[in-house]
Amino acid sequence: MQIWPAIDLLGGKCVRLQQGDYARETVYSADPAAMAGDFQRQGARYLHLVDLDGARAGRPMNLDAVRAIVAAVDMDCELGGGIRDEATIESLLELGLSRLVLGTSALKRPEWFREMCNK
């Protein structure tokens, strides 16, 4: 079994939204890299990251936090939120992310999504 703990990023912090409402957030940590390290020390081998600002803006917004997380841990990390074009995909993979999660762009542009999957 694979278990992927998740870190939702909003304004560079680790948060949870109540029922997806950006106005009702709970901040769990102001240091996402430290939280990722805690997950690794507890035995996690994988990490799921969600850029909530990126999901709203249509482009990744928490890149400093993502860079810090990838540098701080020795785990496969995946990211979703605001990934809408090939240049973004390439730059995120260059950061050291193992996987990317595409939702909106995959649904709205299935031909493009197929092309990206076949690269």
Region locations from a protein language model:
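Conserved anion-binding
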Residues: G12-V15, G20-A23, L93-K119
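Hydrophobic transmembrane alpha-helix bundles
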Residues: L47, D85-E94, N118-K119
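Catalytic beta/alpha-barrel core
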Residues: L47-V50, D76-R84, S98-R109
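Short secondary-structure transition/capping segments
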Residues: R59-N62, I89-S91, W112-E115
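Conserved N-terminal beta1-alpha1 strand-loop-helix module at the mouth
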Residues: M1-M75, I83-A87
